[in-house]
Amino acid sequence: MSVTDRTTRTPQADLRLSQSSGSGMPIVMIHGSGSSRAVFARQFDSPLADAHRLIAFDLPGHGDSSDARDPAATYTITGLAQTTARLLDALNIGHAIIFGWSLGGHVAIELASFHHAVNGLVLTGAPPVSRGPLGMLRGFHANWDMLLTSKKVYSERDIERFEAFCFGGSASPSFREAIRRTDGRLRSGVAFGMFAGKGADQKQVVENAPFPVAVINGEHDPLVRLSYFETVAYASLWERCHVISGAGHAPFWEKPDLFNPLLSRFAEKVVKQSAVMPVRRTEAG
């Protein structure tokens, strides 16, 4: 298996991405706030990369991608989803499994509300909440560290706290630098947009999804309320809401030996179902 890196220009930003040489259905992986595509290293270093075309990219304002050309328009859930859609189109991806972690999960849900390529959705650390502050409060824990997700400028202490919040003691040394590099305007823009109720009603998108939806969370996730996921009336939930024992907010990084087989099994399900599903039409661009 080989991994190639490239930069793709979109109207929103220049996006740096990595992709494996696997020939199976693409799995597009979207990282969380303050992270980068490097967080999916343990999926690339697994049989998944041989079985599927794994694609991970740095969101605008993150990693090796450029900052947004128009921060006000791009640094929202809708703007990031539109950026992802442009990338899929540039890569000629007509069908894919979208795996979104944390912020990336919310971007994935928004993308699924309008883009025809989404054949399956994997959500980790990303509760599909209704619009506005009440929906947010139902899906997320209310604690002081959550305020970091909307803070524009980080001190070194903030960087340390956010790293521990997301990864506990499991972080790679490079993860702290990824947090430091992040364009803080994204944090404030995304948080404002979500509390203002902008974008799709994520709960409705997931409840009405015509494709399989996998929910895989960490047992000790400090950000999200695991009980909330059980209140969602999924039309197409795969198996059940899976919980990775002993993991926190990033179970795919902390416990890849448990996470990767679930992702592989879900992908097999999506491939089989996609063979008989009608082609979805793009509702918006």
Identify the meaning behind each predicted range.
Residues 237-285:
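Catalytic active-site module of serine/aspartate enzymes centered on a nucleophile-bearing elbow/loop
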Residues 31-33, 96, 100-102:
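Conserved alpha/beta-hydrolase "nucleophile elbow" surrounding the catalytic nucleophile
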Residues 100-110:
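Glycine-rich nucleophile elbow surrounding the catalytic serine of serine-hydrolase chemistry
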Residues 47, 210-247, 253, 258:
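Conserved loop-alpha-helix segment in the C-terminal half of the alpha/beta-hydrolase fold
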Residues 55-99, 261:
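Active-site loop/oxyanion-hole signature of alpha/beta-hydrolase fold enzymes
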Residues 132-134, 152-207:
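Conserved alpha/beta-hydrolase catalytic His-Asp/Glu region
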Residues 13-67:
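Conserved HGGG/HGGXW glycine-rich cap/lid loop of the alpha/beta-hydrolase fold
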Residues 110-150:
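Flexible "cap/lid" loop of the alpha/beta hydrolase fold
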